[in-house]
Amino acid sequence: MATKLQDENTPCLAATPSEPRPTVLVFDSGVGGLSVYDEIRRLLPDLHYIYAFDNVAFPYGEKSETFIVERVVEIVTAVQQRYPLSLAVIACNTASTVSLPALREKFAFPVVGVVPAIKPAARLTANGVVGLLATRATVKRPYTHELIARFANECQIAMLGSAELVELAEAKLHGDSVSLEELRRILRPWLRMPEPPDTVVLGCTHFPLLRDELLQVLPEGTRLVDSGAAIARRTAWLLEHEAPDAKSTDANIAYCMAMTPGAEQLLPVLQRYGFETLEKLAV
C-alpha cells in the first residue's frame, strides 16, 4: 500500500525527474538512518534514494546476530527485486557490524556500512577521554573493541550502551519532546566522572537526531562525532568508481515493513526529507 500525505502544510517536492539517476538504498531498523541519508543527500542531492526501515523488528540492538544477518539480507533482496541498485548503505551500526560480509557476498553492487567514528575522535580529544555512546550490542561487539585497540589505544574510552536513547530519538521524530532529565539520568555515569569525555562518539545513527539535547546535558565544549560525513564521501567515491549503472527516473520512496499507525505518523517527516511516498515492503 502506498500512502501519500495530501496536506497544505506539506513541503512541496520537485516533480519526478526525467533524467535517470543512480539508485541508492539507505537501510536502518528505524529512523536513525535518516541522519546518514541527510549527509549523503547534502553531498549528492541528485540521486534516486530509497529509504527502508524495519519497524517490525526494531530495535536491532537486542536481536541475535543470526537474526539480524538473515533479516537484513532478506530486506535488501526485496528492495533489489523492485529496483536495480547502484549502492546500498546499511545505516545501522548494529547491523553493519554483523551483516556486511553476507551482503557483500550476495550482491554485486557496493555495500557501505557504518562503524563508530573512534579514529577521528581519538585525534580530536584534548584530555584523552573519549566517550562511546552506542547500543549495548555495539558496545559488546568484538569489532568495536578492535577499532579501539587499533585507533584509540592511548585514550581512555568510556563506553555507555543505551537502548533508551534509540527510543527517545524515534519519539522525537514522531513529534514528542525529549526530556533533558531523562538524558541526564542516562548519561549520569559520565557526568559523575572526575574528568568526563571531552569528545563523544555517536555510535548509533539515531543519536545525531538528539545532538541538540545531548549538547545541553553534556559538559560545555564537548565535541560530538559521528560517521555521517565520512559515509557520504565514501558513497560518492564508490558511485564514481565501482557502482553498476543502475539508474531510475522514479521519485524517492520510503519503505516500512508494516503500515502501522506509528509508520503513518512519520509521513510528514519523510516528506520533509524528500520521500514522496511510503509503502509497505513485502518480505
From Swiss-Prot:
Q: Name one GO molecular function term.
A: glutamate racemase activity
User: What EC number(s) does this enzyme carry?
Assistant: 5.1.1.3
Keyword Cell wall biogenesis/degradation attached: yes
Does the keyword field hold Cell wall biogenesis/degradation?
A: yes
Q: Report the top EC class in one word.
A: isomerase
Q: Identify the domain of life.
A: Bacteria
**Binding-site positions, substrate:** D28, S29, Y60, G61, N93, T94, T205, H206
Q: Tell me the active site.
A: C92 (proton donor/acceptor), C204 (proton donor/acceptor)
| Metabolic or biological pathway, per its Swiss-Prot or TrEMBL entry | Cell wall biogenesis; peptidoglycan biosynthesis
Its BP terms in the Gene Ontology are:
cell wall organization; peptidoglycan biosynthetic process; regulation of cell shape
**Pfam families reported in the protein's UniProt record:** Asp_Glu_race
Alphabetized, the UniProt keywords read: Cell shape, Cell wall biogenesis/degradation, Isomerase, Peptidoglycan synthesis
Q: Report which reactions are catalysed by this protein.
A: L-glutamate = D-glutamate
Q: Which family does it belong to?
A: Belongs to the aspartate/glutamate racemases family.
**Function text:** Provides the (R)-glutamate required for cell wall biosynthesis.
HAMAP family recorded for this chain? Glu_racemase
State what protein this is by name. Answer: Glutamate racemase
Its taxonomic path starts at:
Bacteria, Pseudomonadati, Pseudomonadota, Gammaproteobacteria, Enterobacterales
